[in-house]
């Protein structure tokens, strides 16, 4: 049976040629499962996956956001985002969306599996162009909490280097914890 052979050879293969076109969120799942299980996406499946990428723009922001957040909770999240980036998927989601560079650094020092969706969403958007973070968050239908945290992030980024502790306190008192 071809399915058992694929498992033995650690190949991920779709069942029919329209699979990614019928539901292009399967692209995210294919990448997630291939990285999680150490499988290689079979060559014809990869061709069809690439063809399906252009359809991602027809998927609701909520579904895309949900898939990206699921990836953030995976142990292999960095390699999964590298794969998304290498296929150009992040740029299809939004031209200013960038690979979350800080994901690897943060993952090494903090257990982000326990973070809530607002914190994960902010981390996801942190490496994107600051001028477009809110636009990206809105296009992905992220929560109001994410939008508030992103505005707090702007406050943090605009802090001057040589500032007194009292001034730092005044600036940070209203910044949501997720932005910190």
Model-inferred region functions:
Residues 2-10, 44-55, 60-63:
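Short, conserved phosphate-binding/catalytic loop or strand-edge motifs used
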